Every structure is written in structure tokens, then in C-alpha cells.
């Protein structure tokens, strides 16, 4: 994945002044940056997920803007810490959830259905209604692949869809109530989350006989289905390029702005969403894999 990022950034005119393929090389590279020998405009972290914590912390501490591959962390607690420290230190952290830039997602965001859905969620939240008027169902399956085997299926596949949900829905409407894991293994998860004003079902399988990337949304007797793996015009946009452009745009505005809690920029809201997605996915490990399914804390 790192080579793909490098190649596409270089096509946009970005020059890489340092590349690390091992932990030792990364350590040496950070030392050169800290000493002032190297003065990069930003860093890209596309290493195994278990190393993201270490590298993101270093970037935040140095206030070095960073694009980090998903997931930003495999710990809900660490994700919350990143969110706090990034805000406190005014450090730009951009998580590489390229699915946000899928053409199907971008087009759906422009539809009347999407705007009505977001309006209803806000209205129901303000009225303090505890109902499930809107239901999401995310399905993401594919055959066996040796990639990303350093993390379980929820951090490999399901995290994409949880991030999409967080980017679709205002956080006030996502007050967590309960979680039910219908099925859970290292390669397959079927989980249902109940929030205050919506229900979200996730099916992710990385050892499946079929390939699927769909989002189904039901509201007021109507429904829409998004096929994230198909493009009607026959000319699929390269989501990773759109992701890079969004990061570079954020980087440009970041250099000329001051961040505070009352005026968070779009890039910070995106980072908050990515961190919240990790927190919600982490509940599976905390509540089920550790045998604490009956200790759900709505906080």
C-alpha cells in the first residue's frame, strides 16, 4: 500500500525525501526529522496496523502532518487519545479511508434522500425520540487474500463501513445503546448496533465465496442500495487519488489556520469520525472477545 501512495503522490508532483521499509529505518528517519536534518511537509504511514500507534504519536508530538492508512489504531482508547492530542497540539492527522471518496458515496451525498435522512436524524435527536426510524445494512465480503492479516476482520473490512456511517450521520444522532454480535470469528463478523435514532447492521467476511460491497438504507418505507464496487458510467474514479487531493487541500488550509474546539475544520471532523469509528468497532473486542457481552456501558 505504501508504494501505491508513493506512486500516486509523485504523479501529483510530491517529492519524497525519505522512505522507510523497516522499523529501524523508520526510527532513523524520525531522528533526522527531529534533529532538523529533514524538514518534510508531511508524512505517510502505510505500515502494519499494529505500528500505527507509535508512528502517529510521533507525528502528533512533532506537529508533523500525517496521512495514516486505516485503521488509525486498533485500540478505542488510543484513538480517543489521538483525537484529544491532535486538537491540543493543532496537529493534522488524516486517516486513509478511501471509501469516503468512492463515486457512489459522493453521488449519494448529493441526493434528496440523503439530505432528508440527515434532517430527520437531527429532528428526532432534538425531540429526544428513542426510535429506529432509519436502518443501515453494510455488506463487505471477498475471497481469501494474504493482505492485512495482521488485524482481525473488523479492523480490516468492517472499519470501512463504520467510518462511512460516522461520516454520514451527525454524532449527536449516534448515541450508542447496545451491540449484538450475531457471528464472530477472525475472518467473519456479523454485528448489529442500536443507536438512539438508528440501527446499523454490519456483515464483513474476508474468506467468502462472493464479492460484495453494498450499503442499504431504509427510511419511512423507502430504501436505497449503493453498490460501491460498480460504476454506471464505466469509468471508475480512482478513490485513492481523490483521497490524496482531499489531504493536500486540508494541508494547504491547515498551514494558514489556527485550530480550537469551537471552530474545528473539516479535516479535524474527518479525523474525529475516523477515531469514533475505531471506538465503536473496538466494542466488539472489548465486549465479546473478552467475554464481557453483558457489561455494555452506553457511555
Name each model feature, range by range:
Residues 32, 42-47, 91, 249-299:
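C-terminal helix-rich "cap/oligomerization" subdomain common to oxidoreductases
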Residues 50, 73-144, 295:
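A contiguous active-site-proximal alpha/beta segment in oxidoreductase catalytic domains
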Residues 5, 23-85, 97, 105:
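Beta-loop-alpha module in the N-terminal Rossmann-like domain of NAD(P)-dependent dehydrogenases
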Residues 141-210, 272, 276:
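Rossmann-like dinucleotide-binding domain that binds NAD(P)(H)
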Residues 1-27, 33, 248:
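N-terminal Rossmann-like dinucleotide-binding module
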Residues 17, 41, 134:
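Conserved acidic residues
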Residues 182-187, 195-251, 255-258, 266-270:
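NAD(P)-dinucleotide binding in Rossmann-like oxidoreductases
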Amino acid at each position: 500500500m505504501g508504494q501505491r501512495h508513493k506512486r500516486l503522490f509523485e504523479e501529483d508532483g510530491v517529492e519524497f525525501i525519505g522512505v522507510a521499509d523497516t522499523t529501524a529505518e523508520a526510527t532513523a528517519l524520525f531522528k533526522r526529522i527531529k534533529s532538523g536534518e529533514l524538514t518534510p511537509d508531511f508524512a505517510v504511514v502505510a505500515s502494519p496496523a499494529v505500528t500505527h500507534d507509535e508512528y502517529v504519536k510521533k507525528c502528533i508530538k512533532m506537529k508533523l502532518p500525517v496521512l495514516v492508512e486505516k485503521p488509525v489504531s486498533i485500540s478505542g482508547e488510543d484513538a480517543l487519545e489521538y483525537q484529544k492530542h491532535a486538537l491540543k497540539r493543532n496537529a493534522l492527522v488524516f486517516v486513509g479511508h478511501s471509501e469516503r471518496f468512492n463515486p457512489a458515496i459522493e453521488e449519494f451525498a448529493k441526493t434528496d434522500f440523503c439530505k432528508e435522512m440527515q434532517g430527520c436524524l437531527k429532528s428526532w435527536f432534538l425531540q429526544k425520540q428513542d426510535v429506529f426510524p432509519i436502518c443501515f445494512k453494510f455488506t463487505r465480503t471477498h475471497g481469501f487474500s494474504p493482505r492485512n492479516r495482521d488485524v482481525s476482520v473488523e479492523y480490516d473490512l468492517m472499519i470501512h463501513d463504520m467510518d462511512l456511517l460516522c461520516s454520514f450521520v451527525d454524532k449527536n444522532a449516534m448515541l450508542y445503546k447496545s451491540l449484538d454480535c450475531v457471528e464472530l470469528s477472525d475472518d467473519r463478523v456479523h454485528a448489529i448496533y442500536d443507536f438512539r435514532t438508528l440501527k446499523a447492521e454490519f456483515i464483513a467476511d474476508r474468506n467468502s465465496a462472493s464479492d460484495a460491497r453494498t450499503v442499504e438504507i431504509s427510511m419511512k418505507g423507502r430504501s436505497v442500495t449503493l453498490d460501491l464496487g460498480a460504476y454506471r458510467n464505466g469509468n471508475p474514479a480512482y478513490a485513492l487519488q481523490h483521497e490524496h487531493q482531499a489531504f493536500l487541500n486540508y494541508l494547504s488550509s491547515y498551514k494558514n489556520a489556527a485550530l480550537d474546539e469551537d471552530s474545528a475544520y473539516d479535516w479535524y471532523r474527518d479525523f474525529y469520525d475516523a477515531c469514533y469509528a475505531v471506538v465503536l468497532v473496538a466494542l466488539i473486542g472489548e465486549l465479546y472477545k473478552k467475554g464481557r457481552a453483558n457489561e455494555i456501558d452506553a457511555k
